[in-house]
C-alpha cells in the first residue's frame, strides 16, 4: 500500500484519462495492520484461542515473504489477506461489544463500500478526469 503498481494509463485528450493501478482498499489493508496489532496484544493479555489461531496463520503466511530481500508486490500478500480480514472482524467485534451497539459494524462496512466506489475508477481503468485521479493520490509515493 505504500507504492502500488501502476499497470496502465490512457490519455483521451484534455483533462480526461484512464488508469489501472494495483492497490487495495485502504479500509481493509490499513485497518488490517491495526487489527494485527490488536491480535498481538489480545493474545498476550487474554490468550483467546480464536485470536491465536488467526495470528498464527497471519504469521505463517506472511513471514516467508517478509524475509525476502527483494521488492515485494501486493500479490505476495494475498495468502495473508483472508486472515487479515478475520483479524479485522475480531477487532470490529471487540469494538462493537465495547460500544454495546452495532453502529461500528455499519460504519466500517459503509467505509469499505465507500472506498471501493471511490477507488473503482483507478483499479478498473474507467475513464475519468485527471483531477479525480490526482485526488486519490493520498501518499506522495502513489504514482498513477
Q: What function would you assign to each model-found segment?
A:
Residues 66-78, 126-127:
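Membrane-interface catalytic loops of GT-C/OST-like multi-pass glycosylation enzymes that act
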Residues 72-92:
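Hydrophobic/aromatic-rich transmembrane helices and adjacent perimembrane loops
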Residues 57-65:
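Hydrophobic, membrane-inserted alpha-helices
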Residues 62, 86, 112:
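Mobile, glycine-rich extracellular loop/lid and propeptide segments
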Residues 41-49, 88-107:
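Membrane-interface junctions at the ends of membrane-embedded or membrane-associated helices
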Residues 12-15, 21-48:
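Hydrophobic, aromatic-rich transmembrane alpha-helices
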Residues 1-23, 132-144:
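Juxtamembrane membrane-water interface segments that cap and precede transmembrane helices
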Residues 94-144:
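Transmembrane helical bundles and short interhelical boundary loops of multi-pass, membrane-embedded
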Amino acid at each position: 500500500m505504500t507504492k502500488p503498481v501502476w499497470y496502465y494509463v490512457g490519455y483521451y485528450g484534455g483533462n480526461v484519462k484512464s488508469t489501472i493501478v494495483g492497490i487495495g482498499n485502504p479500509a481493509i489493508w490499513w485497518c488490517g495492520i491495526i487489527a494485527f496489532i490488536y491480535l498481538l496484544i489480545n493474545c498476550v493479555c487474554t490468550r483467546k484461542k480464536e485470536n491465536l489461531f488467526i495470528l498464527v496463520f497471519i504469521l505463517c503466511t506472511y513471514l516467508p515473504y517478509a524475509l525476502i530481500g527483494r521488492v515485494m508486490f501486493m500479490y505476495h500478500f494475498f495468502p495473508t489477506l483472508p486472515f487479515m480480514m478475520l483479524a479485522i472482524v475480531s477487532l470490529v467485534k471487540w469494538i462493537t461489544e465495547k460500544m454495546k451497539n452495532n453502529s461500528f459494524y455499519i460504519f466500517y462496512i459503509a467505509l469499505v463500500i465507500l472506498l471501493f466506489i471511490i477507488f473503482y475508477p483507478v483499479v478498473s481503468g474507467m475513464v475519468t478526469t485527471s483531477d479525480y485521479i490526482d485526488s486519490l493520490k493520498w501518499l506522495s509515493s502513489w504514482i498513477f
